Amino acid sequence: NSRIAHVPKSKKPLNSASPRFHPTHQIIETKPSTLHRQEWGLKSSIPSKVQTRYIIFNDLDTLERLTTFEPNAGSQWSRLRFQELGVAPSYNAGKSNPLFEGSSSSSNQLVPLSSLLNIDPTSSRTDVEKKLSQVKSLRKVFKKWLLSKDPEALKNKSFSAKDMSDNAVEFLSESVGTNTGLNSASLNKVIGTGGLSYNIGGRLRQSPNGVVSKTVVPGRFLNVEGNDRLAAIGGFVANAGSSSPNTSQIDYNMGDFIRELKFPFAVNRAFVQDNGKVVLRANVISGMSSKARMQMSGKNYQQRPSRTTSPAVNPEDSTKYAEELLNILTNFDSGNGKKLR
């Protein structure tokens, strides 16, 4: 079911008083046309007292043939605001794509060996040693596979270290793809972006004003002390930096009341951690400096004169002007004739 593919099954209650730093339950939405029938695409209908379009649940079905749910849409609006940012979430290099941790995890071209063995910097030493022992046990099988693939290169030793490394990666990808399925450990953590966004990095975004090269959104500073500036952007707490002297002066003058002001922020990067926490990095966009403002005010710009338009002529006026012109021409011809006589 694609609706429950991103957020793992949680053991926490639906209404928990403990602080939450990321969504713990999957949100299901129904359309207005099916809300009056209380149809949510589940195995059973929802009681008619529920008026919201968003619910969270623990079990699709129980022994009592009931779905445990709660009407809650707090994280839904955070997801919509994040999608309005237009930022594609990225992943740390050295880890396989969490959407494809099974047989297709070898598609990660940055670190193929770590992707195949499912090893990252957070892996324990015992797990790494266990994976290496499993790889060493495949040495004989790898020789047979290499002999069947290219016996001439193995016989004449006409291969380089890079060729051998590529062959090893290809052999491991085949063996991992045939011997293992979906990693059971991936079912206990957030898969991919947790349904937060499906934007692809490098995608060209258009707007009525042209191509959008930078995401600029309003935000508020949360603290003024220390080098680690925090800002509230789109319902998330982002790591923000500022090198503008104007912004620093405003921070110093306002102190804790800096939260009353809005600043434009450019969101540079966003990535989702294994526990579902969203990390944003943004920079505040400074305004025009005082030096540039003085240069702009010192320049004299000549304003283009306004274009005058001739008034419209009525049909009666045009007829009157035509008669006057005809009389002038007639009198001019008669006067010339008298002089000639």
From Swiss-Prot:
InterPro entries: Rbsml_bS1m-like (IPR016712). Residues 1-12 have a biased composition (Basic residues). GO terms for molecular function: structural constituent of ribosome. Residues 1-21, 291-317 are annotated as: Disordered. One of its GO terms (cellular component) is mitochondrial small ribosomal subunit. GO terms for biological process: mitochondrial translational initiation. Residues 297-312 have a biased composition (Polar residues). Pfam families: Mit_ribos_Mrp51 (PF11709). This is Uncharacterized protein in HIS3 3'region. It comes from Lachancea kluyveri (strain ATCC 58438 / CBS 3082 / BCRC 21498 / NBRC 1685 / JCM 7257 / NCYC 543 / NRRL Y-12651). The lineage of its organism: Eukaryota, Fungi, Dikarya, Ascomycota, Saccharomycotina.
